[in-house]
Curated annotation (Swiss-Prot):
This is Kinesin-associated protein 3. It comes from Strongylocentrotus purpuratus. The keyword Lipid biosynthesis does not apply. One of its GO terms (cellular component) is kinesin II complex. Keywords: Repeat. ARM repeats lie at residues 332-372, 373-411, 577-611. It comes from the Eukaryota. GO terms for molecular function: kinesin binding.
Amino acid sequence: MQAEDARYLKRKVKGGSIDVHPTEKALVVNYELEATILGEMGDPMLGERKECQKIIRLRSLNSTTDIAALAREVVEKCKLIHPSKLPEVEQLLYYLQNRKETTQKAGAKKGELTGKLKDPPPYEGTELNEVANINDIEDYIELLYEDNPEKVRGTALILQLARNPDNLEELQSNETVLGALARVLREEWKHSVELATNIVYIFFCFSSFSQFHSIVAHFKIGALVMGVVEHELKKHLSWNEELLKKKKTAEENPASKRDFEKSTKKYHGLLKKQEQLLRVSFYLLLNLSEDPKVELKMKNKNIIRLLIKTLERDNAELLILVVSFLKKLGIYVENKNEMAEQQIIERLAKLVPCDHEDLLNITLRLLLNLSFDTDLRGKMIKLGMLPKFVELLANDNHRLVVLCVLYHVSQDDKAKSMFTYTDCIPMIMKMMLESPTERLEIELVALGINLACNKHNAQLICEGNGLRLLMRRALKFRDPLLLKMIRNISQHDGPSKAQFIEYISDVARIIKESNDEELVVEALGIMANLTIPDLDYEMIINEFGLVPWIKEKLEPGAAEDDLVLEVVMLVGTVATDDSCAAMLAKSGIIQSLIELLNAKQEDDEIVCQIVYVFYQMVFHEATREVIIKLTQAPAYLIDLMHDKNSEIRKVCDNTLDIISEFDEEWARKIKLEKFRWHNSQWLEMVESQQIDDGEGGLMYGDESYSPYIQESDILDRPDLFYGQTGYEDGEMYDGQVTPEYVDEYGNVQNGEYLGRPASAMYGNRYQSEYESLRPGSRVAYLTEDGQPLDEYGNPIEVYAESVDQYGRPVTPTYQYGSQAQQGPGYPY
């Protein structure tokens, strides 16, 4: 401030009362600041008064502190306290020393939750009594070229200006001041923490507004600040190592204990200064990471490792900032994976619960983001965080985010059973039943739906009047999600399922009368789950007239697939009753199911449930004949016998096995289809080989050794059943000739088998006396004495026994081992 300007501004500070802080070990000093603008004649023209507070935190105050010495120190350092108030300060300090701290469990109390990051305070060591003036900016720049104390003072004055957003435009236009600040930071940040903190804070003020990010980037402040952070973290590590050495020395040598205490005090002082620098540095980087490209550069420079390393600190405000930064970075899977490698869950576990509401809330939100990863959810369970989450349900500040975390955890089947050993189920039941709104919070009921999938959890829910109260609320408010939770309870066998008998009429009434499709789907699911042996399904179906309703919903296109699936499942359940199954069969529902099967053949769930209905129908004698004789259900089952879905194949096989036992015609067809399927690869190979031989080996199109595979049923070829050449002597093991073989391929005279008939190619060329010399592919001609010669005139060996059409000797017995390798297999 210029000397001539000082005449026109008068500043006056008036001390006030001193109080103790309500929750912390601190004194609150109240004072009044009065600023007056004077005219040229010294007359006051404009004045303003402002009530202010200064908090003096007493971190060293404990049961052994010298109160008198501490009071003198406070009065000497704080100019706002008049020396005459020393006795009052002593009395307040004595009260703080003896005030009992509340022992309420951390995280269980409901404190103040701001939900936003606080701006870092100015560096405590550089608080000035003078007020900065934008008109004196040139003087402040000159201070940056002086010694270190003057540099600190100059940066503190510029910081005062920068903290006022109205001054940022003018400071931005002054490249000299920004360039000087960047130069000093780059050259001297290692020499003074105070200087580095002030300059980083100035650029932080610019980073708070997106339009000034280009200024910060121009001077490469982001990269410089990351270097500062990394250096400070390494320095902190060396401090800890040095302090640990002195602690060990003090334990071994009591004389050095005083030196250790002195070092500890110095360490805490340095730590406090360093954490101020780290806080403003991370805040600046967080603001700059608004640009994804800048954030990627930070990631490549290991910002995640630096942040996770900082989680070891105890400063709540610094931790809030660090966790917020990690939460922002964690939305990208690459960053999440790196956090997992850096053991982030172990670092966050110590923060749950904690006394600071904002820190606890942002930590839970980060854990919620991380809980999308299955492995990280498992790590939370291993570290014992589940009971901690459950305890936090009592805190309204965190209840919603905790419900979301618990919902993610409950998705894992192994984790569901662990909820049994916590107070989670009683707590969520209380929340559901005491909810003032008609529809429950979706996070709350979603957690209940997942937990109800576990049998032990379902039993806990049903204890006492639990199921009764849930049903009463669901029926009163027609809540489909609550009914879904009840449906999950109904799927478990045991005592809980029997409790549903009381509510069957209410559930059936919803099915028949409700227009809410979601509600009807869940009601159908409950009915389909009630597989109770003594339940009279026929009476229920008749009482509410559900058969016409079921037939209507089974018409293709009449309802959504979810509803159709539940209807089919209900039919499968009621079909377990003989009389009810007969009633459904007579009503034509089976034909409706077949039509639905044709329409929904791509939907595996619906197909599987329809096949299950057929399985139930063929189980009962009353409906078995209807299924087998009056419908084409077995044919559809044969088509589905080799479906890609293993569950469909399994149910099909079981159903077809039952059909085979009671109907010979279908048994033969089923056996034939199984044979075709089992040997399909071999049959395709034989077919392709025959076609290839036919295309290349015949001189004329009408020549043929035997009927082609494509001209007749492949299963009517006994030679394919028993080997490439059939039974070589036309006999079976018992010596009898198989009739089919004789009809097609053999001659019988006086009850004796005379062998295969001559082929079309050779049958008229040779007389019977030369039958044993049927030429093979090598024969050229015969000599006068009947000796066969090949095309080169060489004699060919004459077989003593008979040969086949290819010149190969016919084996008198069936060679099982060799033929089995050539012929088809059989699935039995």
